[in-house]
Amino acid sequence: MAAPPASMSAAPSPLQSAVAPDVPGRQAEQNETACEDRSNAGTLDRLLPPVGTGRSPRKRTTSQCKSEPPLLRTSKRTIYTAGRPPWYNEHGTQSKEAFAIGLGGGSASGKTTVARMIIEALDVPWVVLLSMDSFYKVLTQQQQEQAACNNFNFDHPDAFDFDLIISTLKKLKQGRSVQVPIYDFTTHSRKKDWKTLYGANVIIFEGIMAFADKTLLELLDMKIFVDTDSDIRLVRRLRRDISERGRDIEGVIKQYNKFVKPAFDQYIQPTMRLADIVVPRGSGNTVAIDLIVQHVHSQLEERELSVRAALASAHQCHPLPQTLSVLKSTPQVRGMHTIIRDKETSRDEFIFYSKRLMRLLIEHALSFLPFQDCTVQTPQGQDYVGKCYAGKQITGVSILRAGETMEPALRAVCKDVRIGTILIQTNQLTGEPELHYLRLPKDISDDHVILMDCTVSTGAAAMMAVRVLLDHDVPEDKIFLLSLLMAEMGVHSVAYAFPRVRIITTAVDKRVNDLFRIIPGIGNFGDRYFGTDAVPDGSDDDEAATVG
């Protein structure tokens, strides 16, 4: 019943931050069968278009989550193919918290199954399943000995770490990243490695004591009690504890009669009156589950935000912020800008001079890091008073795909720098940025983070990336946003929402056109750099795939 891993953070599936439990089903079997049929039909060559004499440009990928099914199911897992829309307003703050559903009920009543059915029926991305089983307190040596003999009461409110539960749920509702313990029921202890959860639009919290704490109740937007016959619950508990938790039948029955049943009568069943919805028969009650799903959908519609339009209409005619630093426009810098802005420039020259500018930009950005006095001894035995970096560590985070091109320049000047990536794409139907994927190094909250994107026009993607870093507890004044070219609109948007973020670029252009493209601009940087510049719609910057 432990919650499935979310992070992003973890091993980078292209949509790893979209958390969902394993949902086997008929559709999953059909998808897997179809995949097997295609793989058996022939070699990879049969799946590729014929190669002609001319070079065929690759197509950029954009999100269309409102016109395509947002799910890809296999027999083992559910992957959300739609990105996460903005969860903050144009001020960079979260205007509405994630929707939290509490699932209570007796042990083995089917809470986890009901939760998974709700997730499957919702068909929306970014759902987090949080299990109360992960929050059992760490047992003392004496308590572990009692638990090994089935003499410890795990069905009492005192067995749970409610302080950790409440703080974790609060952070999730605020959109922040959290670390969740993994409880080992075989050894009755927490495992060393905790799992990361992040990016919840909907939180489903389930557990036997889900309604046992007043503060916890106030965090739940919807409370559901799963009511199942006691005999069925006993059979399920026997099967689960014997097969999954290494117990014997005598020990399970002893524990049930001594602790589980009395705890249900004393602590759990009375909380049924606190529930908004009571689901008899658990997962077999499809009518109740459909009603729950309809209500959650209506709540999500009320939480939809439109950020990009608000950015376009704000901050007109304001002076450039003091947090902006533009690389000195020397003849050399202007000469390189002339080359990369020229539409006739070959791809090789575009890459060469872009890399030169990136190197200069990174070197310029490093001068804003904190330094302190230090003394070293020269080979001549003399003291030299100089400077050394006063921070803990430098981490680079690139906004895919164009921002990835700046990573080599950062690695060239920062030894052993850690690198993370964030993928943000535009939904063509809504025009809003959507978070599809992130992979961030562990423990970045004390690092100075260099956030890299080659062009910033409206600032929508940059704002989303900064918001992700803040959700992972990176201080705002330790974030440096680097870009080769920015529009004034993007500079104002980021600076207004995050006034302590340092913005560093090689040039700032005045205008953004009606299609939110920088004028005069540089063209679509990613297409020109990666050789995918023949785009039918005539896009002239990376916004067609990634919101700048």
Curated annotation (Swiss-Prot):
> Where do Low complexity bias regions lie?
1-18
MF GO annotations: ATP binding; cytidine kinase activity; uridine kinase activity
Example GO CC term: the record gives:
cytoplasm
- Name any one Pfam family assigned in the record: PRK
Modification comment: Ubiquitinated by RNF19B; which induces proteasomal degradation.
* Family matches, as CDD domains: PRTases_typeI, UMPK
What is the annotated localization of this protein? Cytoplasm; Nucleus
EC number(s) per entry: 2.7.1.48
User: Top EC class per UniProt?
Assistant: transferase
Where in the sequence is Phosphoserine found? S56, S63, S539
Record keywords, A-Z: ATP-binding, Cytoplasm, Kinase, Nucleotide-binding, Nucleus, Phosphoprotein, Transferase, Ubl conjugation
Region Disordered: start-end pairs:
1-74
Keyword Ubl conjugation included in the entry's annotation: yes
Which reaction is the catalytic activity of this chain?
uridine + ATP = UMP + ADP + H(+); cytidine + ATP = CMP + ADP + H(+)
Give the pathway: Pyrimidine metabolism; UMP biosynthesis via salvage pathway; UMP from uridine: step 1/1
Tell me one GO biological process term.
UMP salvage
Query: Where, in this chain's numbering, is ATP bound?
Result: G105, G106, S107, A108, S109, G110, K111, T112
Q: Where on the tree of life does the source sit, at the highest rank?
A: Eukaryota
Q: Which InterPro entries match?
A: P-loop_NTPase (IPR027417), PRibTrfase_dom (IPR000836), PRK/URK (IPR006083), PRTase-like (IPR029057), Uridine_kinase-like (IPR000764)
Write down the PANTHER family for this protein, in alphabetical order: URIDINE KINASE (PTHR10285)
Question: Which family does the record claim for this protein?
Answer: Belongs to the uridine kinase family.
Q: What does this protein do?
A: May contribute to UTP accumulation needed for blast transformation and proliferation.
Q: How does it assemble?
A: Interacts with RNF19B.
User: What is the protein name for this chain?
Assistant: Uridine-cytidine kinase-like 1
Q: Which organism is it from?
A: Mus musculus (Mouse)
